[in-house]
């Protein structure tokens, strides 16, 4: 039934659905996992890297996380070539605003500007929607630290913690369970991000080269965006594994004590 309505992006099906937009969202479901967590003292992005070739030059290559301006960064899930076009557009919008008003663009305004472009691609014929979902982290003087998510339809929302990409439903339920509102520090958010990625990524053992993590904090009145080095990620993974092993031991001891009773 749907085949008559999915050839053009602008045609509604009898149920009121735009199939091309839904197919674009489907593309994101197969992309590497990306998650964002908002903490009291900062905000972070963590992403799964799929392209981990030994000959890849790390200096020039960031697969999932991009800096947009001095106060914002984003992470992408979906078709990487589409993502490059959108991140370039985000940078241009931010620079134009800075040139015009002599101050950094508010986070939500930048997200809205890009979502207007994404939405236009669902309404005009002859073009397909962008097959990309983005997570944006940023800081501005109006609302402090912020985390946003947008999808191919041009829809966006502010989040405390969220996930896009492969196994995102499982990751979101874990975040819902473990996110402690008002108590999250960046340190505990990093530990939670590693825990979630460990559970949701389709690998038997989490390794540092498969993970990209960026943090956004404020230091002496300036926003600092840092992409964690591989050694730092290794330490986080090692710490998580030690805690898992400790919890497992305690669980076994408890079971043993109950048996002995």
From Swiss-Prot:
Residues carrying Phosphoserine: 13, 75, 173
Gene Ontology annotations for the cellular component aspect, listed alphabetically: cytosol; nucleoplasm; P-body; proteasome core complex; proteasome core complex, alpha-subunit complex
Classification via InterPro entries: Ntn_hydrolases_N, Proteasome_alpha, Proteasome_alpha-type, Proteasome_asu_N, Proteasome_bsu_CS, Proteasome_sua/b
Matches recorded under CDD domains: proteasome_alpha_type_4 (cd03752)
Keyword set, alphabetical order: Acetylation, Cytoplasm, Nucleus, Phosphoprotein, Proteasome
Pfam families, A to Z: Proteasome, Proteasome_A_N
Residues covered by region (Disordered): 240-261
Chief site of localization: cytoplasm
Oligomeric form and interacting partners: The 26S proteasome consists of a 20S proteasome core and two 19S regulatory subunits. The 20S proteasome core is a barrel-shaped complex made of 28 subunits that are arranged in four stacked rings. The two outer rings are each formed by seven alpha subunits, and the two inner rings are formed by seven beta subunits. The proteolytic activity is exerted by three beta-subunits PSMB5, PSMB6 and PSMB7.
Family of the protein in this entry: Belongs to the peptidase T1A family.
Protein name: Proteasome subunit alpha type-4
Provenance organism: Mus musculus
The encoding gene: Psma4
């Amino acid at each position: 039934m749907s085949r008559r309505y999915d050839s053009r992006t602008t045609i509604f099906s009898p149920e009121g659905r735009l199939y091309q937009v839904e197919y674009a969202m489907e593309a994101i479901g197969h992309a590497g996992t990306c998650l964002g967590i908002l903490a009291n003292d900062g905000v972070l992005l963590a992403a799964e890297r799929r392209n981990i070739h030994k000959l890849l030059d790390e200096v020039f290559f960031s697969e999932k996380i991009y800096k947009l301006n001095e106060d914002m960064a984003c992470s992408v899930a979906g078709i990487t070539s589409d993502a490059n076009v959108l991140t370039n557009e985000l940078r241009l919008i931010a620079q134009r605003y800075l040139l015009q008003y002599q101050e950094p663009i508010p986070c939500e305004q930048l997200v809205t500007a890009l979502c207007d472009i994404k939405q236009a691609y669902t309404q005009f014929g002859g073009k397909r929607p962008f097959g990309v979902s983005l997570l944006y982290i940023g800081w501005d003087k109006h609302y402090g630290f912020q985390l946003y998510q947008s999808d191919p339809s041009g829809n966006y929302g502010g989040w405390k913690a969220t996930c896009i990409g492969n196994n995102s439903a499982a990751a979101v339920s874990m975040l819902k369970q473990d996110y402690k509102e008002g108590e999250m520090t960046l340190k505990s958010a990093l530990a939670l991000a590693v825990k979630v990625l460990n559970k949701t990524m389709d690998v038997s053992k989490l390794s540092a080269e498969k993970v990209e993590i960026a943090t956004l904090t404020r230091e002496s009145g300036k926003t600092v965006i840092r992409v964690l080095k591989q050694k730092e990620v290794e330490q986080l993974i090692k710490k998580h594994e030690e805690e898992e092993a400790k919890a497992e031991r305690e669980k076994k001891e408890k079971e043993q004590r109950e048996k002995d009773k």
